[in-house]
A protein has these predicted regions:
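Exposed, low-structure sequence patches enriched in small/polar residues
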Residues: 1-169
Length: 169
């Protein structure tokens, strides 16, 4: 992973990821064309991301870096490309993500957080590489997620997700 960040809120990052997933238990993948079982799925991904967050300030701790000014708007654009044949990658994929975040203060009525995320999978990929909605599987509330929904319930190649959270202080 390489990250370049400026003082005025612009960040550019790029990364290369390789992973290999095997099926376990009663889960089996079969190719539709010939019925052959696929025992392992290997992917190699290259990502490029742009992020613009003007006016953000951070606090550095020993283990992490936390933003303390959540009032600034954030716009992010990321493209992830699956590389077929490179380092064992078996599938070509192209996933583009565009996200917008903004916090709006309402005076003595608290504040509202607005999140909008759009994703598009441009290539024909296996169902395990399709887009999943942000599902909250825990018993704790998490912002910008959907509760009371099962994992892997709605897979698609296009997604537009928005959420509004109102904290009344």
């Amino acid at each position: 992973t390489f990250t370049y960040e400026t003082d005025w809120g612009f960040r550019f990052d790029t990364s290369l990821r390789w992973q290999s997933n095997r099926t376990v238990g009663n889960l089996h993948y079969y190719r539709v064309s010939d019925g052959e079982e696929i025992r392992k799925i290997r992917t190699t991904d290259a990502s490029v991301g742009l992020n613009y967050n003007p006016g953000v300030t951070y606090v550095n701790t020993k283990q992490q870096r936390l933003p303390i000014n959540l009032d600034s708007p954030e716009i992010s654009l990321r493209h992830t490309m699956g590389l077929d044949g490179f380092m064992g990658g078996q599938y070509q994929s192209n996933l583009t993500t565009l996200g917008i975040y903004k916090r709006q203060w309402l005076g003595s009525f608290g504040y509202m957080d607005f999140n909008i995320v759009g994703k598009a999978q441009w290539s024909k990929v296996p169902f395990t590489m399709l887009i999943q909605p942000p599902v909250n599987l825990s018993i704790f509330e998490q912002e910008a997620t959907i509760s009371m929904m099962k994992d892997w319930e709605f897979l698609s190649d296009r997604q537009l997700f928005w959420s509004v959270a109102w904290d009344m202080n």
